[in-house]
Amino acid sequence: MATLSRNLRLSLDTPTSTFVRTKIVCTIGPKTMSEEALIKLIETGMNVCRLNFSHGTHDYHGQVIKNVRSAMEKTGKIIAIMLDTKGPEIRTGKIEDRCGYVDLFVGQEILVDTNMNQPGTSFRISIDYKGLLDSVKVGGYILIADGVISLSITAVEKEKGHVVCRVNNNSRLGENKNVHLPGAIVNLPAVSEKDILDIKFGVEQNVDFIAASFIRKADDVNEIREILGEKGKDIQIISKIENVEGVDNFNEILEVSDGIMVARGDLGVEVQMEKIFVAQKMIVSKCNAAGKPVITATQMLESMIKNPRPTRAEATDVANAVLDGSDCVMLSGETASGDYPYEAVDIMAKICREAELVESSTDYQTLFAALKLSSAKPVSIAETVASYAVATAIDLKADLIITLTETGLTARLVSKYRPSIPIIAVTSWSYTVKHLLATRGAIPFLVESLVGTDKLVESCLEYAMKHNLCKKGSRVVIVSGVMEGVPGKTNSLRVLTVGESIKDLKV
């Protein structure tokens, strides 16, 4: 009923805020790896750049990271870097034709083997799973490229080292495409040797997030944390949920993860098509209840790889991901290899703003009660203060919330209760600044020390007024701790009114 009541009040003429609370993750590829392209993505709205380690060498990714940091320096804006592992997945090999793809036609026969040294043709391709012949059976399927290409298994010829398949649909097969064997028992390690090398490379490069592919259970996350070691202890792990086992074990995975990605591409192949939205809503809602960031990904604006405008369905999909509660929405091929990368980021930001406007029309008391009810018990002092800071901001029609937070926990707890206003998160820890770029509504603000609350608040208000986040007469809610600069001691809530000058504040 709360949704119905909200929707009945909607209008196309409602003015839109200039501030986008939902964060945008952009995959960087050949079209956008240059410093100039990265600067344009940052200025258009990118918050997190994703490096897909299913493709590219360490030298390539190292150059991209160097370019990202140079672009940050030139724009004066901070961007987080996410290393997305290849994971224990199966992929196709190289193609013989110089164009890098072959056309397949419905009804034709094609052989599938595991000889990755031999380039594929329209009659024979390879995949990198050595256990293929022991895992599949006649009557099963091999699904390629997020299930776009479907092959029916007609024979398993172990003595010849290949599987005979029939092509079920006209399609174009490229190199290094993901492969699924639905219904087959696939024995793959949680973390491959390549993943270990890539994660260690990420530690050396000081990346901010590891997006861990094909997480199936909590132990998979713990294994990655061990690989990160002491040197990589500040790198956060975003667990990608992309198979049925990951969905079944989601509660234990969420508990040990720093955040979650709903990787709908592979998940959509493993889960029945009509059930994908159920999985998405369940995962996002559980992340919201836990106060952990969640990214909705895959095919969000897919048509913009080739077209300057998204489909109506895609625009609605992005909006619904925001309304579901996503902290971030992600672009993949749209920005990695598409013809309209900047337009894709721009339209995604516009859709997010509109969806946030709709969300802010929801009866807040109903939302607040639901979030309180779903929170783990007992509730911490920090969460109690954070939740009532948001409730106070709503009641007083405040324009801004300021949190003083070392680890970012207080800011995430405030964000959990979904205020419709910006959250300036003041911290003296540089990695916290990067991590908060995946938290909805958070604007990280780096300072030398959290000692001296009043001066920090003055600095924040100067920044906020400069960026039109508040004005004279605005009410501002401050969340901090009596023990200044001590992590985990959030226990104080204040309300200030911005006066004639920054220093003219009323408590």
UniProtKB/Swiss-Prot annotation:
<keyword id="KW-0418">Kinase</keyword>
<dbReference type="GO" id="GO:0006096">
    <property type="term" value="P:glycolytic process"/>
</dbReference>
<comment type="similarity">
    <text>Belongs to the pyruvate kinase family.</text>
</comment>
<feature type="site" description="Transition state stabilizer">
    <location>
        <position position="240"/>
    </location>
</feature>
<keyword id="KW-0547">Nucleotide-binding</keyword>
<dbReference type="InterPro" id="IPR015793">
    <property type="entry name" value="Pyrv_Knase_brl"/>
</dbReference>
<keyword id="KW-0067">ATP-binding</keyword>
<feature type="binding site">
    <location>
        <position position="265"/>
    </location>
    <ligand>
        <name>substrate</name>
    </ligand>
</feature>
<comment type="pathway">
    <text>Carbohydrate degradation; glycolysis; pyruvate from D-glyceraldehyde 3-phosphate: step 5/5.</text>
</comment>
<keyword id="KW-0479">Metal-binding</keyword>
<feature type="binding site">
    <location>
        <position position="266"/>
    </location>
    <ligand>
        <name>Mg(2+)</name>
    </ligand>
</feature>
<feature type="binding site">
    <location>
        <position position="298"/>
    </location>
    <ligand>
        <name>substrate</name>
    </ligand>
</feature>
<dbReference type="GO" id="GO:0016301">
    <property type="term" value="F:kinase activity"/>
</dbReference>
<feature type="binding site">
    <location>
        <position position="52"/>
    </location>
    <ligand>
        <name>K(+)</name>
    </ligand>
</feature>
<dbReference type="InterPro" id="IPR018209">
    <property type="entry name" value="Pyrv_Knase_AS"/>
</dbReference>
<feature type="binding site">
    <location>
        <position position="177"/>
    </location>
    <ligand>
        <name>ATP</name>
    </ligand>
</feature>
<dbReference type="Pfam" id="PF00224">
    <property type="entry name" value="PK"/>
</dbReference>
<dbReference type="InterPro" id="IPR015795">
    <property type="entry name" value="Pyrv_Knase_C"/>
</dbReference>
<dbReference type="Pfam" id="PF02887">
    <property type="entry name" value="PK_C"/>
</dbReference>
<dbReference type="InterPro" id="IPR040442">
    <property type="entry name" value="Pyrv_kinase-like_dom_sf"/>
</dbReference>
<dbReference type="GO" id="GO:0005524">
    <property type="term" value="F:ATP binding"/>
</dbReference>
<keyword id="KW-0630">Potassium</keyword>
<keyword id="KW-0808">Transferase</keyword>
<dbReference type="GO" id="GO:0004743">
    <property type="term" value="F:pyruvate kinase activity"/>
</dbReference>
<feature type="binding site">
    <location>
        <position position="54"/>
    </location>
    <ligand>
        <name>K(+)</name>
    </ligand>
</feature>
<feature type="binding site">
    <location>
        <position position="50"/>
    </location>
    <ligand>
        <name>substrate</name>
    </ligand>
</feature>
<dbReference type="InterPro" id="IPR036918">
    <property type="entry name" value="Pyrv_Knase_C_sf"/>
</dbReference>
<feature type="binding site">
    <location>
        <position position="91"/>
    </location>
    <ligand>
        <name>ATP</name>
    </ligand>
</feature>
<dbReference type="InterPro" id="IPR015806">
    <property type="entry name" value="Pyrv_Knase_insert_dom_sf"/>
</dbReference>
<feature type="binding site">
    <location>
        <position position="266"/>
    </location>
    <ligand>
        <name>substrate</name>
    </ligand>
</feature>
<keyword id="KW-0460">Magnesium</keyword>
<keyword id="KW-0670">Pyruvate</keyword>
<dbReference type="GO" id="GO:0000287">
    <property type="term" value="F:magnesium ion binding"/>
</dbReference>
<protein>
    <recommendedName>
        <fullName>Pyruvate kinase</fullName>
        <ecNumber>2.7.1.40</ecNumber>
    </recommendedName>
</protein>
<dbReference type="GO" id="GO:0005737">
    <property type="term" value="C:cytoplasm"/>
</dbReference>
<keyword id="KW-0324">Glycolysis</keyword>
<feature type="binding site">
    <location>
        <position position="84"/>
    </location>
    <ligand>
        <name>K(+)</name>
    </ligand>
</feature>
<feature type="binding site">
    <location>
        <position position="85"/>
    </location>
    <ligand>
        <name>K(+)</name>
    </ligand>
</feature>
<dbReference type="GO" id="GO:0030955">
    <property type="term" value="F:potassium ion binding"/>
</dbReference>
<feature type="binding site">
    <location>
        <position position="242"/>
    </location>
    <ligand>
        <name>Mg(2+)</name>
    </ligand>
</feature>
<dbReference type="InterPro" id="IPR011037">
    <property type="entry name" value="Pyrv_Knase-like_insert_dom_sf"/>
</dbReference>
<dbReference type="InterPro" id="IPR001697">
    <property type="entry name" value="Pyr_Knase"/>
</dbReference>
